[in-house]
Amino acid sequence: MRLVETIVSGMAGRYATALFELAEEAGSTDAVAADLDRLKGLIAESADLERLVKSPVFTAEEQVKAVGAVLAAAGITGIAANFVKLVAQNRRLFALPSMFDAFAALVAAKRGQTVAKVTVAEPLNDAHQAALKEALAQQTGKDVSLDVTVDPSILGGLIVKLGSRMVDASLKTKLNSIRHAMKEVR
């Protein structure tokens, strides 16, 4: 069993694996990763682009045309651009965020790193990020990079997902636990 098969799975994993292998052959893994990160940021910033990615209403031709224009405007070319256009042509844009995550996991594994998905109520400052990275690195024995998402609905604390493990130290979860405990007392 190849290392790639143990890191990613499903449709998004297959697409990400194909992209990773192409990028490896071309020696442009870092450039492709940077292009995908830029596109991921554009999708997060634009409600219209997010709607294009997630909505099944648009035809494949409309998606390819729109994505092509976005890629050209963002200066994303080569392997990454061709990959995203192929995904649009195959009507799989809805899975693009999962493909980004799977590709990032493959790149991190190649570098001997692991990616921790961290959800926080407010942005972490540099000192907190460094402390969290250090604590996770001690637990895993690997270099850890953080994928931080801000979600005010967790109220406080944080949620850390690292591989198949998850630690939920959010205030929302603690309050829900207290609420359930109080219901049982009645």
Swiss-Prot record:
It comes from the Bacteria. The keyword Membrane applies. GO terms for cellular component: plasma membrane; proton-transporting ATP synthase complex. It is a peripheral membrane protein. It is found in: Cell inner membrane. It holds the Pfam family OSCP. Its main location: membrane. Keywords: ATP synthesis, Cell inner membrane, Cell membrane, CF(1), Hydrogen ion transport, Ion transport, Membrane, Transport. GO terms for molecular function: proton-transporting ATP synthase activity, rotational mechanism. F-type ATPases have 2 components, F(1) - the catalytic core - and F(0) - the membrane proton channel. F(1) has five subunits: alpha(3), beta(3), gamma(1), delta(1), epsilon(1). F(0) has three main subunits: a(1), b(2) and c(10-14). The alpha and beta chains form an alternating ring which encloses part of the gamma chain. F(1) is attached to F(0) by a central stalk formed by the gamma and epsilon chains, while a peripheral stalk is formed by the delta and b chains. F(1)F(0) ATP synthase produces ATP from ADP in the presence of a proton or sodium gradient. F-type ATPases consist of two structural domains, F(1) containing the extramembraneous catalytic core and F(0) containing the membrane proton channel, linked together by a central stalk and a peripheral stalk. During catalysis, ATP synthesis in the catalytic domain of F(1) is coupled via a rotary mechanism of the central stalk subunits to proton translocation. Belongs to the ATPase delta chain family. This is ATP synthase subunit delta. It comes from Azorhizobium caulinodans (strain ATCC 43989 / DSM 5975 / JCM 20966 / LMG 6465 / NBRC 14845 / NCIMB 13405 / ORS 571).
